[in-house]
């Protein structure tokens, strides 16, 4: 099945502690149906010193959130929208904005 939200998309969080925040999708985890969004759902982890990180301490990193809790922000109209699929004349399958009808994939 084609993914409605992909890496590099700008999304808005619909519910939870970060409701209303927007950010770029850094990683998509299809098996768990989750996405990692830059600057959203930031958690603190206690890191022990190791070979890669000489100094330990508390680090902040983004944690995955469910894909159903985010909505794609349309590049043309700038609104959080649902995504649909359609075929172009040449037969390629593209995503489009359900609010304004513009094609998202160029």
Curated annotation (Swiss-Prot):
Highest taxon in the source lineage: Bacteria
Family matches, as Pfam families: KOW (PF00467), ribosomal_L24 (PF17136)
GO biological process, alphabetically ordered: translation
GO molecular function list: rRNA binding; structural constituent of ribosome
Keywords of the record: Ribonucleoprotein, Ribosomal protein, RNA-binding, rRNA-binding
GO cellular component terms listed in the entry, alphabetical order: ribonucleoprotein complex; ribosome
NCBIfam families in alphabetical order: rplX_bact (TIGR01079)
Family affiliation: Belongs to the universal ribosomal protein uL24 family.
Complex and partners: Part of the 50S ribosomal subunit.
Known function: One of two assembly initiator proteins, it binds directly to the 5'-end of the 23S rRNA, where it nucleates assembly of the 50S subunit.
Protein name: Large ribosomal subunit protein uL24
Organism whose genome encodes this protein: Thermosipho africanus (strain TCF52B)
Gene that encodes the chain: rplX
